């Protein structure tokens, strides 16, 4: 008897174990291919709602300093309480996720609310999926459907106005049917709706594909009727069909159902619409519920009957081209007994798949990065290498060219990156590489050889710790024109007779100047800088004591008063400051009262969040509160105050006051009622009223005068470092005021020991020479201002990856038209016919000069001011002349755009170094 009980218990245990194994296997099978990432999570965890396991993202990004906790008000429905915020000045950060080639996937990113009007872009591979713009206190989601082309996919965040951030990433396999007819496209989810339900969103485990079905109310003119039924014994054969939990509710109407989706992108896109049906009324038979389906009033399905195929459920996939809006309309067919019914629907926008970098180049550069990181952990340049090396933002030090539809790497510049170890031999497999610069590092082992088929034309190995002989395979490369390998202490330079006779530039392995040790540089630099600063300070004291208390800035025709009380201080070894005592200190309590406890957020800048406030005298102000993530201390803040308070000019936003209490660093400026130039050119304000050409020209001149004042600041030039249209503010009189000096620095002078400034700026405006060399000068501002001038002329953003690829960069798109004298092609359509051709040409040619790749060829801001003054005089004189013609009954001049060559010459207000009549090869300045 006892043995029988033991046998029964054993059988029960075995049955339980088998059931458990089957359940685990079933659950594992259901989530095969799922990737669930919780950014900045301390460890892996299981979400109690979905039972899915989320993995921390530390294997991609280990730096915990970029982690933030989501405010409690926002994370009630999220399993992950953290967010990763990438503090980058430009470029992208990507998550590399495993895929199976040719499998269709859904990828979803979840972004908690960060700040109002913050925006950045998201891409799948190098195909831009969309812009994320935060306008309400709620989470943002973006979802795309794609076919994997290899064994991984990059999910990338691209910086726009603010540092990008993310909380969760979810990758899920999907049925093939989703990409039917869109094989080479990425589908961006616009809407996925569960109709008639009033409960929470439905997702995994109810939906085995983990699609998230959100409840939606109808927008039909007359009330739609929710319909629900406890559905059972329904065979859902189609893999794209929603789960029964979604299909058991629906909306119906006796005559018509309509669902309106406004606010779509205004460019023409193809859309895929999935409509899902399940007949919930058991009394309805085939032929009794028949209706027509329209998309944007275009009939797509006539006399559609859910039950026609013999099944209770059905779905249909429809395609349509739309611009700005998409309406789904279901209309009862003639003779039908019942009105239309719809249980759920999905709308997806098709985006063309963009080819990534040449696969071989991609594999080589990724392997090279891995090898370099073995000896160079936490190297800033290598850590910034993320995603595709060429697209959308190229990696630092990499230059690419187009070749047969994909990008190839032609230049690799890793100079001055403090790299150690052996030079990765895999670099020799980059078959398209033409220029390789590895100078000024600490490499100690040379690669073995380059193949004879190499296209290399320039190689720089100088200033490293290489030893031995230069391989003959390098010396004899057929296309090599430049070779530098000097200043490697242990490398032989004796046998140079084998050098390729075709070499044009070489150092023959010799070191022209011995590289001084760091200690020597530091001591000599410190002594030189200290002596120079003391001399400058004493000189300025005597100069200001005897000089009349005002200065006149040449080219501006105006005298600007000096502060009556000034203080001289030497806060650092390489800067001196003139501090005005007119800036008012505010208490933190007063600031909180003026802003009503920081009630109205009006923007985000390089300094931090900006709030609107009102002082006791009624003056409206903009209050900038330094970001909590800033590492700036009290001393640095005081130095910045010294700079800001000393600058007084009608085209610069004045500093009214400051607060430095309880670790809070706050700056107070007057509020600019007309917003920024960006907003007036292509922001929300531009939709209300187009900025006319004379006003644009006046704004350009005002901004140029402000920058010229900074560059000619008494004693030492000040460089803005972040010139862009959003930093040019407009007061009530539309007078331009250059703003945001949080990044400003004094310019280097002769005698400075070295220049070591962190590269700052905004993508689309950044001077390529500054980015490459990290050597800052006034000409860096000039380049950025040239971009602003093109914005003013064209009304376009400096960088917009939503446009066709050839138009992503405003500068690269506009240059060919300007050089071909086809300026009309780039002019903002809103001002066409409303400008004088000669005035416009002056501005365009100044812009082109500003955008010279080499700073030597760019004009200074004072020259730019003179040219813009001339342009404004031409424009104003033409306007007055045409007004007199109009008063006599003549036609408006704006009906004709005059050809510039037919115009009489004008008298310049001052001799300028800018050539305005030709586009000949530039000369150094």
UniProtKB/Swiss-Prot annotation:
This is Nodulation receptor kinase. It is a single-pass membrane protein. It comes from the Eukaryota. GO terms for biological process: nodulation; protein autophosphorylation. Residues 1-29 form the signal peptide. It catalyses: L-seryl-[protein] + ATP = O-phospho-L-seryl-[protein] + ADP + H(+); L-threonyl-[protein] + ATP = O-phospho-L-threonyl-[protein] + ADP + H(+). The active site is at residue 722. Belongs to the protein kinase superfamily. Ser/Thr protein kinase family. LRR repeats lie at residues 408-430, 432-454, 455-476, 479-500. Residues 362-384 form a coiled coil. It holds the Pfam family Malectin_like. The chain crosses the membrane at residues 522-542. Keywords: ATP-binding, Coiled coil, Kinase, Leucine-rich repeat, Membrane, Nodulation, Nucleotide-binding, Repeat, Serine/threonine-protein kinase, Signal, Transferase, Transmembrane, Transmembrane helix. It comes from Medicago truncatula. Autophosphorylated. Binds to PUB1. Its EC number is 2.7.11.1. GO terms for molecular function: ATP binding; protein kinase activity; protein serine kinase activity; protein serine/threonine kinase activity. GO terms for cellular component: membrane. Expressed constitutively in the entire root system, except in root meristems. The lineage of its organism: Eukaryota, Viridiplantae, Streptophyta, Embryophyta, Tracheophyta. Residues 596-873 form the Protein kinase domain.
């Amino acid at each position: 008897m006892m043995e029988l009980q033991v046998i029964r218990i054993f059988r029960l245990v075995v049955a339980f174990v088998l059931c458990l194994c089957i359940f685990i296997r079933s659950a594992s099978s259901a989530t095969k291919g799922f990737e669930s990432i919780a950014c900045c999570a301390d460890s892996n965890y299981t979400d109690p709602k979905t039972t899915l396991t989320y993995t921390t993202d530390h294997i991609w990004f280990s730096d915990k300093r970029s982690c933030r906790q989501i405010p409690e008000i926002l994370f009630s429905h999220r399993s992950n309480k953290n967010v990763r915020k990438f503090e980058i000045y430009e470029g992208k950060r990507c998550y590399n996720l495993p895929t199976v080639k040719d499998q269709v996937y859904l990828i979803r990113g979840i972004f908690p609310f960060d700040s109002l009007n913050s925006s950045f872009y998201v891409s799948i591979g190098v195909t831009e999926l969309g812009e994320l713009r935060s306008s309400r206190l709620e989470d943002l989601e973006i979802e795309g459907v794609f076919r994997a082309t290899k064994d991984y996919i990059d999910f990338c965040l691209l910086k726009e106005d603010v540092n990008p951030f993310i909380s969760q990433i979810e990758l899920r396999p999907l049925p093939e049917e989703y990409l039917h007819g869109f094989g080479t496209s990425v589908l961006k989810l616009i809407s996925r709706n569960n109709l008639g339900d009033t409960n929470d969103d439905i997702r995994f485990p109810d939906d085995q594909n983990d699609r998230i079905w959100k409840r939606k109310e109808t927008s039909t003119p007359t009330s739609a009727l929710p319909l629900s039924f406890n559905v059972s014994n329904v065979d859902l054969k189609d893999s794209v069909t929603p789960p029964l939990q979604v299909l058991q509710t629906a909306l119906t109407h006796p005559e018509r159902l309509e669902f309106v989706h406004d606010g779509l992108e205004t460019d023409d896109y193809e859309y895929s619409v999935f409509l899902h049906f399940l007949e919930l009324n058991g009394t309805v038979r085939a032929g009794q519920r028949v209706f027509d389906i329209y998309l944007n009033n275009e009939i797509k399905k006539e006399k559609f009957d859910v039950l026609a195929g013999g099944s209770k459920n059905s779905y249909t996939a429809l395609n349509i081209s739309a611009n700005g809006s998409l309406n789904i309309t279901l209309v009862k067919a003639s003779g039908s007994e019942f009105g239309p019914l719809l249980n759920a629907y999905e709308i997806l926008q098709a985006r063309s798949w963009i080819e990534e970098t040449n696969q071989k180049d991609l594999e080589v550069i990724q392997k090279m990065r891995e090898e370099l990181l073995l000896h160079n952990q936490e190297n800033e340049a290598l850590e910034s290498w993320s995603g595709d090396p060429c697209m959308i933002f190229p990696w630092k030090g990499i230059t690419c060219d187009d070749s047969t539809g994909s990008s190839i790497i032609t230049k690799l510049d890793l100079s001055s990156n403090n790299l150690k170890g052996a030079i990765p031999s895999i670099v020799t497999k980059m078959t398209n590489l033409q220029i390789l610069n590895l100078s000024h590092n600490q490499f100690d082992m040379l690669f073995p050889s380059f193949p004879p088929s190499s296209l290399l034309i320039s190689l720089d190995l100088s200033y490293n710790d290489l030893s031995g002989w230069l391989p003959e395979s390098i010396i004899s490369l057929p296309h090599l024109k430049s070779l530098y390998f000097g200043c490697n202490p242990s490398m032989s330079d004796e046998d140079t007779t084998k050098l390729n006779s075709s070499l044009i530039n070489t150092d023959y392995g010799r070191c022209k100047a011995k590289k001084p040790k760091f200690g020597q540089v530091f001591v000599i630099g410190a002594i030189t800088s200290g002596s120079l600063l003391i001399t400058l300070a004493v000189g300025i004291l005597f100069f200001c004591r005897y000089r009349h208390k005002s200065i006149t800035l040449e080219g501006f025709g105006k005298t600007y008063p000096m502060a009556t009380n000034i203080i001289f201080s030497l806060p650092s070894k390489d800067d001196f400051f003139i501090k005005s005592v007119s800036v008012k200190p505010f208490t933190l309590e007063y600031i909180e009262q003026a802003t009503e406890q920081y009630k109205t957020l009006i923007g985000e800048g390089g300094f931090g969040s900006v709030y609107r406030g009102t002082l006791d005298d009624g003056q409206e102000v903009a209050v900038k509160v330094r970001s909590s993530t800033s590492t700036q201390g009290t001393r640095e803040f005081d130095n910045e105050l010294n700079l800001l308070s000393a600058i007084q000019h009608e085209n610069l936003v004045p500093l009214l006051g400051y607060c430095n209490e309880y670790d809070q660093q706050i700056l107070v400026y007057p509020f600019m009622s007309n917003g920024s130039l960006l907003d007036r050119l292509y922001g929300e304000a531009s939709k209300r009223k187009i900025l006319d050409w004379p006003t644009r020209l006046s704004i350009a001149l005002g901004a140029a005068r402000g920058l010229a004042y900074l560059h000619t600041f008494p004693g030492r030039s000040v460089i803005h470092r972040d010139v862009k249209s959003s930093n040019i503010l407009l007061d009530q009189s539309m007078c331009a005021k250059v703003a945001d000096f949080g990044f400003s620095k004094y310019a280097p002078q002769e005698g400075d020991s070295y220049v070591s400034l962190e590269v700052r700026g905004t993508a689309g405006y950044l001077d390529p020479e500054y980015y490459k060399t990290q050597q800052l000068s006034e000409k860096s501002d000039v380049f950025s201002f040239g971009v602003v001038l093109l914005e003013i002329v064209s009304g376009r953003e400096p960088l917009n990856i939503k446009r066709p690829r050839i138009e992503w960069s405003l500068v690269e798109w506009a240059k060919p038209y300007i050089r071909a004298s086809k300026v009309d092609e780039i002019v903002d359509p809103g001002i066409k016919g409303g400008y004088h051709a000669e005035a416009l040409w002056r501005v365009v040619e100044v812009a082109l000069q500003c955008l010279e790749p080499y700073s030597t060829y760019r004009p200074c801001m004072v020259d730019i001011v003179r040219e813009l003054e001339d342009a404004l005089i031409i424009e104003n004189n033409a306007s007055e002349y045409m007004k007199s013609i109009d008063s006599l009954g003549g036609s408006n001049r704006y009906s004709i755009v005059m050809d510039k060559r037919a115009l009489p010459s004008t008298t310049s207000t001052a001799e300028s170094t800018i050539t305005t009549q030709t586009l000949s090869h530039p000369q150094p300045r």
